[in-house]
């Protein structure tokens, strides 16, 4: 059967007929038409620390018992806490694992063995994570998972620190001429590091695939503060203006000096907006004036976006040359749910030729808090003339979902209808391609203490909504070490209603 041939099951409809006419019942009835047993990916993101803290077999037991997991996304390389380490310090500890934070021990890095022969074309090899001693998460977990018919996908991100040996050779250069903490896609040392690390994993371990995450956006959106924590972005520190990017820009016919002038003017616009200094013709008109005066602004933005796409393609083809059977794909960040500019750059049809799968973040519980942060930021820059609630309504309209008012969403989160709409939109964006769509599901992603928290029912409804929208699978996110087993159980409840539970 084709992987997108969906089996309509009268049995699933019979199960849900006895449920109350609630959102979950409606989703289960509709999703039953998209539920093909043994064809859906039920994935979970998990870091190395969980296997060390709880024991490999116990963790795998929990995954199967509470969520019917059939695919592991092992966080193998990162210097960030978003996908590795224990619970974020200060957030409530989950109902499993070590009941203490790893504030003094977490280092990040590569949680697998580094084989130097694959890094000959770069000065940067990454560093072996030291917080768990010599523990190799791939060597330990893959054989145990194989015995249970659970697949293993290596999961990594481009989150770095400035104190890593040789990292300066990879770093982006910001508008002010300083090294940034981020690294440049056009830098051969970084590109070759990425190719080296995926070759290392592909040749050294019995993996099923690789998923890479870059939760960054280009200089234009960053300068405008067009993301959930955008108010913290200094517009004079946007990237990248390194020699490699300048050379690439010139090859495209973009004048780097004009681009710098444009971004300096944009930085002044943003700084004045944050100080309440309204332009004579208003914020939106003034922004358009800058874009018309400096078309290099958008040209530089697209240079960055194309460089990311080229990195995707390079990773994809390098892995396929080594082992065509390995799946390769990408994680698209939550900014996709808030910033229309960023969404425009996430052209799924353009990404599909170099993607076996794409995970789209649909983190509904934390989305309310994050959307509120985004609105707070852009209401001081490009949309400074629009009252915040009207601005939110505008975004609901152009992004095609309807959630609660601005004053409420940090405390309610987004509904499962948002997950449904985003899955349907992404499915349509991938129409006619062979790329699998995996919906990223929020399970206890940290929020502020008084803001919305996940629940078993909320997780259940999000999973049901994803399958109603014809997702090829789900990925329970962000990391197991912050998830409550009681909330994870909500995923299994949904899968049972869909007859996808083993």
Stretch-by-stretch model annotation:
Residues 20-43:
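C-terminal segment of N-terminal export signals and the immediately downstream linker at the start
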Residues 62, 120, 124-125, 129, ...:
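Polysaccharide-binding and catalytic clefts of secreted carbohydrate-active enzymes
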Residues 69-130:
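Aromatic-lined carbohydrate-binding/catalytic grooves of carbohydrate-active enzymes
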Residues 35-54, 444:
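Boundary/entry segment of secreted carbohydrate-active catalytic domains
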Residues 50-66, 106-143, 307-311, 414-422:
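Aromatic- and glycine-enriched glycan-recognition loops and surfaces
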Residues 5-26:
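N-terminal export signals
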Residues 58-80, 204-207, 469-473:
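Catalytic domains of carbohydrate-active enzymes, especially glycoside hydrolases
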Residues 355-369, 412-425, 432-493:
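Substrate-binding cleft of secreted/luminal carbohydrate-active enzymes
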């Amino acid at each position: 059967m084709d992987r997108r041939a969906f089996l309509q099951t009268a049995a699933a409809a019979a199960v849900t007929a006895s449920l109350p006419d609630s959102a979950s019942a409606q989703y289960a009835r509709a999703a039953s038409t998209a539920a093909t047993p043994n064809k859906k990916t039920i994935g979970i993101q998990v870091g190395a620390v969980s296997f060390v803290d709880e024991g490999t077999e116990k963790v795998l037991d929990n995954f199967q018992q509470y969520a019917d997991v059939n695919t592991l996304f092992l966080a193998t390389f990162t210097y960030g806490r978003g996908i590795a380490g224990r619970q974020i310090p200060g957030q409530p500890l989950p109902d499993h694992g070590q009941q203490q934070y790893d504030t003094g021990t977490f280092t990040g890095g590569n949680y697998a063995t580094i084989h130097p022969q694959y890094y000959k074309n770069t000065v940067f090899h990454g560093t072996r994570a030291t917080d768990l001693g010599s523990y190799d998460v791939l060597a330990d977990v893959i054989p145990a998972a194989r015995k249970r018919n659970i697949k293993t996908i290596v999961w990594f991100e481009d989150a770095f620190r400035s104190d890593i040996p040789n990292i300066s050779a990879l770093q982006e250069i910001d508008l002010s001429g300083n090294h940034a903490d981020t690294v440049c896609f056009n830098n051969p040392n970084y590109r070759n590091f990425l190719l080296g690390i995926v070759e290392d994993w592909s040749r050294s371990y019995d993996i099923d695939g690789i998923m890479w995450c870059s939760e960054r956006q280009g200089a234009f959106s960053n300068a405008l503060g067009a993301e959930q924590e955008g108010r913290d972005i200094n517009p004079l520190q946007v990237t990248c203006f390194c020699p490699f990017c300048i050379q690439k820009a010139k090859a495209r016919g973009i004048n780097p000096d004009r681009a710098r002038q444009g971004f300096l003017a944009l930085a002044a616009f943003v700084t004045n907006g944050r100080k309440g200094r309204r332009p004579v013709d208003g914020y939106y008109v003034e922004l358009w004036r800058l874009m018309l005066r400096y078309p290099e602004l958008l040209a530089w933005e697209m240079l960055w976006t194309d460089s990311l796409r080229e990195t995707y393609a390079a990773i994809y083809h390098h892995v396929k040359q080594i082992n065509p059977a390995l799946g390769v794909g990408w994680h698209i960040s939550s900014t996709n749910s808030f910033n229309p500019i960023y969404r425009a750059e996430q052209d799924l049809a353009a990404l599909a030729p170099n993607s076996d799968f794409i995970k789209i973040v649909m983190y509904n519980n934390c989305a309310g808090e994050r959307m509120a942060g985004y609105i707070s930021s852009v209401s001081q820059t490009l949309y400074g003339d629009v009252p915040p609630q009207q601005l939110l309504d505008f975004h609901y309209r152009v992004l095609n979902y309807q959630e609660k008012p601005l004053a409420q969403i940090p405390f309610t989160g987004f509904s499962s209808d948002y997950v449904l709409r985003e899955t349907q939109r992404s499915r349509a964006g991938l129409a006619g391609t062979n790329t699998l769509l995996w919906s990223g599901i929020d399970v206890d992603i940290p929020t502020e203490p008084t803001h919305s928290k996940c629940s078993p029912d909320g997780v259940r409804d999000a999973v049901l909504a994803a399958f109603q929208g014809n997702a090829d699978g789900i990925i329970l996110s962000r990391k197991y070490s912050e998830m409550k087993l009681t909330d994870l159980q909500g995923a299994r409840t949904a899968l049972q209603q869909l007859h996808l539970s083993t």
